């Protein structure tokens, strides 16, 4: 086929025309990604300019920059651009690039503007923000799709961008995300409800501080929408103030589907206040306008004109494709004269002009609050339809300390007493958020979730900035198509059982017939005084109409004279809601009665319930409630659940009495009892509370019964019976075994008006209550009367007295003729010890700390060791009162039974065996150790030698702990300490899930002795073990008084023992606690809380304080508490609330435990059980295997301690 020259030229022209347009970027690297095509990454402030060149064999080539009308506070970029057109190319220069220049730049031709032949490059300009700062976008939701413009300023992995809708992550949105445009939500992904404003939030997962908020509504509340055109003023984020540069912009935007000349025959005109705008630019070209007004700047790609103040612009040249025209007035150096109304007029040849005014007003002093954007300020919504109220505002000057915002709600309610102001706080139905949207721009939001009709009203946000207050108000009407009638009575004494009200006659009442509705509705109010009559309406003058915010209806005031039935009807959209109520004059009450126990004494108070009493609870309910179930229910605070009791239901007169009998009551029945009146639809409770006192038998207040009273012959004297109990006992007095009737008994005291010689002798009072009897013995010495017999002779049986005297005489004749005075005293101590074995102790005494009931403790002779089985070796240490020597205990039995025949022990004895007081102190320490059961973290008693106490042989034998005291152990290993603590945990947590501590990972690799090493794992173990031991002592109970690392022993296997239970301090004076001069001297004051320092008050909570100090010692490797404070100012230092600083080797969780132990109030300190739980939780989280190893080691130690009795038991005990 032959082709003519003409056809060839035409074909060549077509081919040339169809060649794609190309775009070139000068001086910057162009990257490519399949998701967005070509792109360039720039940095604001670093890369100043960028030039683009568009090539192609087409007419009218040009580069179209991105439209930026949605950018927050930034003008169009025409002011910073240059352009030059040559044949087949178009050169475009963007100067001083900014973050807001981010977008797609198109190379297009007027011939193929919508063709695939055009080319594009996307430019990212990054500064600080990941997302391009855009203004809040209002979107006309048409049911198809919504664009959430989360555009990024740099190329990112789209998986790191998340979208949240009303604070809920929308996972399905990721598939529609393009970082050039944002998220595209289809109708299937998210559907907006009518009248709703939805809060969208874009988050960048690699940086929690990077996010962006959008509020998308059905329409822009500040825009006028007419025939597919938006006409509105753009509100800048900047705050106008004197001397500032400022701009305002009026926009006309076409949003319809017509793509050809959508703005043809449309124009907008700006007018300034005080005739400052110079007019007269009709029919002028844009170029001419620029010439005639120096303030006019025009960029060809944009359809926006910028004019200085004193300028009026009416017309511009628009291309056939432009969909938006704008007018901007720039103010250079604002003055007070610039304030006023600026008018923007939209002129359309076929319609009436549309006018929008902008009120430019600012505080001359500088302090301002500028409202930038608000959500729709009048809303009518359906019940349970969520919505969002928000305000974006700017403050000047920038001072966050002086800016405050407060949400409130105004509504009228006659029921509540008139106009109400409710301060809104965060809750389930209303959530307040505050965010910063710029350097001086803030965003306050109130999310109304599932609003009820009762949430209608005027919502007010009050913003305060220094001396300026500005309010934004919303009128919210929540409506429901369902009628809702209510009948209520405003009376606090009313008893309401379902639809029956019971109250006294002649009561003044106000009864409300209301419909819960925010809009007008029909309400009918009727009554009757006889149940056989028809309901009838009220006369109008009897009712007062109510038209409140969400309550419509009537109020009726009357005096109750007889039973009356009321009916309230609400009719809405052919639906009816009816409520009935009956007012009658019956009443109710609950009460209880006490029947005393048969063991009660006559003097017990009749109004107090004690254990063992019988209690009868009665609930009186009006007979009108006969159709309801009525029963008693008991809430037990210990069990945290309700216990239902059967009840009797006798009916008397017009009342129903529901009775609950509780016999032989205990303290577990203390609590609140509810009388329940219930049917299928309703439940009402009447409550009464009872308190049951725990009973305790009489007990001695001073732990002994050996007081002596001196009296003068002929003078009066009083004897106090130092016995108490619960209930308070009855007191009966005896003299020499016979009732004493001479004196007058007043409470627990015996008053004798005149002492006689026959009063010389032993008195005792018998204190009796329902739980038992205790006797207190008092010796009265009347001056001039003969001495009485020995004290103990009067408190033992007569036969034992006789035997005792005979034994004493024989001992004096044959056993004591050669004894020294000191030996006599020791002999007396031995005999007194034997006597103590015969006492029985009350339960109250047993509840006292063990060191306070030392006189009532006995020595368990199962611990007795034959001295011949004990080998005493070298001295291990000595102190003021005692000496500790190393030794071996040979097994009492000749059989080995699989154990070593010799046991290493520590042997403690006094420094002066002839000193009776010293020996007494050591014997009391022995009794105390007998009273403490074995525990792997408490020093264990093995046995004792007491048979020859009368000649000074008293030895306390304990297990031998071979590692020395903990304080020296820690100090000696400072140089080898391996710190496993790192910033967020411990170094042994290389694999957190395995939780393998260093001490177990390297166990097989350690070439040095484990005892000579020290690491953080050891410190955690030691801290937990001390808490274990102290919790064991606290449960006995035993108060240590002197817990410190120097009084803690450690074994070669790093198991600790708490030692030195503090009896020495009890028997010395206060000098032990006095401050000394040397900082290194281990002063107890540095381990004591303030109450112990000032009042010498020692409790388990003072031990907890000392435990916290021990932890400080442990994690400072034997450091001295309060190292920077000298001794002479230490007490004042503690008084002012100072505590030790966190040690460098200590995890913040462990330091929290220390600070809890150092609370000023003892009640605020934790128990040792709570300390154990905190420590275990910490170790379990970071090193579970370490915790398992500790528990395994302690179990092994416990088994070893249980075997000590094999070295003490006699052969007969072993075999039989």
UniProtKB/Swiss-Prot annotation:
Pfam families: Ig_3, PK_Tyr_Ser-Thr. Disulfide bonds join 619-675, 721-765. The keyword Membrane applies. The keyword Nucleotide-binding applies. Keywords: ATP-binding, Cell membrane, Disulfide bond, Glycoprotein, Immunoglobulin domain, Kinase, Membrane, Nucleotide-binding, Receptor, Repeat, Transferase, Transmembrane, Transmembrane helix, Tyrosine-protein kinase. Its EC number is 2.7.10.1. The active site is at 1042 (proton acceptor). Coiled coil: none annotated. Its main location: membrane. GO terms for biological process: cell surface receptor protein tyrosine kinase signaling pathway; nematode male tail tip morphogenesis. It is a single-pass type I membrane protein. ATP binds at residues 876-884, 908. It is an enzyme of class 2 (transferase). InterPro entries: Ig-like_dom, Ig-like_dom_sf, Ig-like_fold, Ig_sub, Ig_sub2, Kinase-like_dom_sf, Prot_kinase_dom, Protein_kinase_ATP_BS. One of its GO terms (molecular function) is ATP binding. Residues 811-1216 are cytoplasmic. SMART domains: IG (SM00409), IGc2 (SM00408), TyrKc (SM00219). Belongs to the protein kinase superfamily. Tyr protein kinase family. Receptor tyrosine kinase which may be involved, downstream of pvf-1, in the positioning of ray 1, the most anterior ray sensillum in the male tail. This is Tyrosine-protein kinase receptor ver-4. It comes from Caenorhabditis elegans.
């Amino acid at each position: 086929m032959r082709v003519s020259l003409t056809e060839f030229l035409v074909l060549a022209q077509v081919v040339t025309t169809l060649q794609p347009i190309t775009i070139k970027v000068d001086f910057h690297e162009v990257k490519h990604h399949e998701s967005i095509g070509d792109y360039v990454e720039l940095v604001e402030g670093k890369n100043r300019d960028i030039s683009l060149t568009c090539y192609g064999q087409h007419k009218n080539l040009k580069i179209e920059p991105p439209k930026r009308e949605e950018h927050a506070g930034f003008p169009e970029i025409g002011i910073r651009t240059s352009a030059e057109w040559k044949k087949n190319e178009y050169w475009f220069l963007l100067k001083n690039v900014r973050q807001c220049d981010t977008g797609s730049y198109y190379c297009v031709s007027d011939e193929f503007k919508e063709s695939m032949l055009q080319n594009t490059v996307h430019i990212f300009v990054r500064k600080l923000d990941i997302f391009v700062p855009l203004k809040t976008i209002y979107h006309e939701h048409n049911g198809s799709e919504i664009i959430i413009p989360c555009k990024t300023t740099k190329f990112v992995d789209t998986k790191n961008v998340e979208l949240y809708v009303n604070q809920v992550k929308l996972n399905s949105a990721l598939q529609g995300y393009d970082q050039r445009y944002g998220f595209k939500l289809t109708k299937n992904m998210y559907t907006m409800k009518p009248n709703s404003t939805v809060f969208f939030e874009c988050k960048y997962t690699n940086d929690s501080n990077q996010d962006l908020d959008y509020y998308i509504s059905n329409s822009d509340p500040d825009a006028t929408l007419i025939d597919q055109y938006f006409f509105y003023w753009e509100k800048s984020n900047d705050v106008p103030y004197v001397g500032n540069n400022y701009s305002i912009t009026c926009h006309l935007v076409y949003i319809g589907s017509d793509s050809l000349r959508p703005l043809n025959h449309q124009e907008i005109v700006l007018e300034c206040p005080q005739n400052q705008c110079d007019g007269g630019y009709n029919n002028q070209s844009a170029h001419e306008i620029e010439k005639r007004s120096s303030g006019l700047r025009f960029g060809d790609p944009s359809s926006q004109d910028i004019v200085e103040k004193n300028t009026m612009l009416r017309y511009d040249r628009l291309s056939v494709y432009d969909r938006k025209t704008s007018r901007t007035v720039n103010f250079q150096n604002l003055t007070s004269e610039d304030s006023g109304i600026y008018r923007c007029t939209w002129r359309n040849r076929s319609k009436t002009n549309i006018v929008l005014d902008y009120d430019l007003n600012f505080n001359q002093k500088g302090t301002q609050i500028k409202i930038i954007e608000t959500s729709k300020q009048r809303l009518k919504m359906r019940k349970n339809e969520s919505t969002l109220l928000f305000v974006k505002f700017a403050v000047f000057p920038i001072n966050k300390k002086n800016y405050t915002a407060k949400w409130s709600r105004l509504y009228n309610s006659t029921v509540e007493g008139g106009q109400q102001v409710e301060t809104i706080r965060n809750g389930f139905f209303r959530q307040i958020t505050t965010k910063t949207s710029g350097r001086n721009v803030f965003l306050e939001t109130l999310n109304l979730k599932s609003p009820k009709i009762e949430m209608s009203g005027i919502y007010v946000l009050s913003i305060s900035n220094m001396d300026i207050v500005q309010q934004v108000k919303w009128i919210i009407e929540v409506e429901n198509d369902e009628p809702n009638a209510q009948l209520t009575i405003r009376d606090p004494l009313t008893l309401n059982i379902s639809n029956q009200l019971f109250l006294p006659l002649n009561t003044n009442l106000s009864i409300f017939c209301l419909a819960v509705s925010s809009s007008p509705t029909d309400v009918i109010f009727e009554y009757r005084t006889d149940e056989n009559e028809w309901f009838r309406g009220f006369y109008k003058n009897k009712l007062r109409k109510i038209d409140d915010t969400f309550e419509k209806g009537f109020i009726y005031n009357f005096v109750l004279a007889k039973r009356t039935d009321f009916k309230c009807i609400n009719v809405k959209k052919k639906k009816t809601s009816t409520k009935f109520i009956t007012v009658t004059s019956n009443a109710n009450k609950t009460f209880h009665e006490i029947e005393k126990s048969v063991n009660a004494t006559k003097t017990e108070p009749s109004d107090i319930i004690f254990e063992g009493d019988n209690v009868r609870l009665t609930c009186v309910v009006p007979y009108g409630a006969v159709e309801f179930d009525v029963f008693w229910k008991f809430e037990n605070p210990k069990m945290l659940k309700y216990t239902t009791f059967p009840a009797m239901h006798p009916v008397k007169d017009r009342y129903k009495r529901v009775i609950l009998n509780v016999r032989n009551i205990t303290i577990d029945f203390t609590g609140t009892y509810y009388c329940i009146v219930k049917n299928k639809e309703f439940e009402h409770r009447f409550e009464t509370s009872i308190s049951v006192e725990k009973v305790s038998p009489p007990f001695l207040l001073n732990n002994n019964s050996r007081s002596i009273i001196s009296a003068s012959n002929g003078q009066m004297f009083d004897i106090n019976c130092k016995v108490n109990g619960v209930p308070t006992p009855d007191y009966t007095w005896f003299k020499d075994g016979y009732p004493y009737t001479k004196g007058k008994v007043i409470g627990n005291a015996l008053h004798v008006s005149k002492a006689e010689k026959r009063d010389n002798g032993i008195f005792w009072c018998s204190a009796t209550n329902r739980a038992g009897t205790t006797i207190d013995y008092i010796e009265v010495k009347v001056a001039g009367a003969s001495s009485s017999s020995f004290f103990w002779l009067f408190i033992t049986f007569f036969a034992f007295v006789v035997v005792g005297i005979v034994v004493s005489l024989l001992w004096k004749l044959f056993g004591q003729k050669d004894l020294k005075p000191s030996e006599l005293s020791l002999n007396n101590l031995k005999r007194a010890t034997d006597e103590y074995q015969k006492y029985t102790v009350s339960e109250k005494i047993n509840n006292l700390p063990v060191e306070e009931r030392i006189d009532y403790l006995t020595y368990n002779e199962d611990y007795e060791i034959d001295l011949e089985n004990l080998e005493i070796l070298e001295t291990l240490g000595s102190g003021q009162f005692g000496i500790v020597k190393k030794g071996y205990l040979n097994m009492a039995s000749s059989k080995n039974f699989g154990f070593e025949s010799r046991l290493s022990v520590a042997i403690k004895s006094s420094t002066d065996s002839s000193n009776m007081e010293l020996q007494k102190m050591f014997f009391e320490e022995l009794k105390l150790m007998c009273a403490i059961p074995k525990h792997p973290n408490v020093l264990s008693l093995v046995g004792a030698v007491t048979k020859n106490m009368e000649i000074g042989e008293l030895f306390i034998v304990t297990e031998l702990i071979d590692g020395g005291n903990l304080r020296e152990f820690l100090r000696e290993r400072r140089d080898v300490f391996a710190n496993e603590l790192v910033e967020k945990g411990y170094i042994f947590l290389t694999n957190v899930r395995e939780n393998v501590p260093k001490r177990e990972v390297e166990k097989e690799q350690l070439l040095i002795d484990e005892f000579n090493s020290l690491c953080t794992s050891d410190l955690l173990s030691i801290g937990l073990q001390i808490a274990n031991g102290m919790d064991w002592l606290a449960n006995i109970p035993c108060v240590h008084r002197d817990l410190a690392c120097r009084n803690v022993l450690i074994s070669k296997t790093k198991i600790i023992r708490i030692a030195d239970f503090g009896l020495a301090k009890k028997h010395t004076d206060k000098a032990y606690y006095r401050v000394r001069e040397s900082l290194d001297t281990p002063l107890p004051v540095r381990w004591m809380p303030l109450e112990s320092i000032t009042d010498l008050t020692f409790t388990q909570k003072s031990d907890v304080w000392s435990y916290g100090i021990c932890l400080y010692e442990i994690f400072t490797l034997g450091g001295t508490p309060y190292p920077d404070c000298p001794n002479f100012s230490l007490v004042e230092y503690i008084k002012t609330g100072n505590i030790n600083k966190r040690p460098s080797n200590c995890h913040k969780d462990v330091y929290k435990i220390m600070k809890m132990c150092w609370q000023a109030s003892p009640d605020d300190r934790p128990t040792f059980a709570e300390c154990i739980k905190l420590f275990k939780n910490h170790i379990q989280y970071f090193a579970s295997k370490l915790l398992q190893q500790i528990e395994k080691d302690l179990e092994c130690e416990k088994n070893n301690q249980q075997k000590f009795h094999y070295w003490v038991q006699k052969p007969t005990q072993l075999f039989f």
